Amino acid sequence: METGQKILVAIDDSENAIRAVEHVAKFFTPSNKITLFSVLQDTVTMFNMNHPELTPYFMAQQTYFGELEEKQKSIVEEAQKKAKKILLDAGFKEENITLKSQHKQKGIARDIIEAASGYNIIVMGRRGLSGIQEFLLGSVSDKVLHSAKDISVLIVN
């Protein structure tokens, strides 16, 4: 691969994401600039906690959902640290590796595409959804692959 590229690696805590990082470590030169990018789910939105028909009991449980959000953030941070170590062990310099995360704004796929503005390539793992789940829900990697314009997308299986 050409050196000096800006590579956005979309990661979460899945094995597929780690395989994508391992692929970058193996096939891209350490002179490339790597951004390990994660999109965090907004727990309030994820569990539809703004719905007006929530029972008072469920409303009282919002603290628990806040704890879930902190746990999710911690899991993503650990995944990013693991990914960074893989790159460092492969010879990438610390100053060429950036860790970045944000809360979901427009949708995970759209957020990844927007974050990739100014990058040469998006690298991500393929999700392990079953055939019916992928048909009904679609996968983030599929959405990125088919929606990204003016940027290469590499899906690692």
What is each residue range found by the language model?
Residues 114-157:
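Gly/Ser-rich helix-loop-strand patches that form or flank binding pockets
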Residues 70-75, 79:
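Low-complexity, serine/threonine/proline-enriched polar segments
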Residues 22, 110, 142-143:
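Active-site phosphate/pyrophosphate- and oxyanion-stabilizing loops and adjacent acidic/basic residues
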Residues 81, 85-121:
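Structural beta-alpha unit
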Residues 2-66:
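Small/aliphatic-rich secondary-structure junction motif
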Residues 35-37, 98-102, 154:
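General small-molecule cofactor/ligand-binding pocket signal
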Residues 17-20, 108-109, 137:
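Amphipathic coiled-coil/heptad-repeat helices and related helical stalk/stem segments
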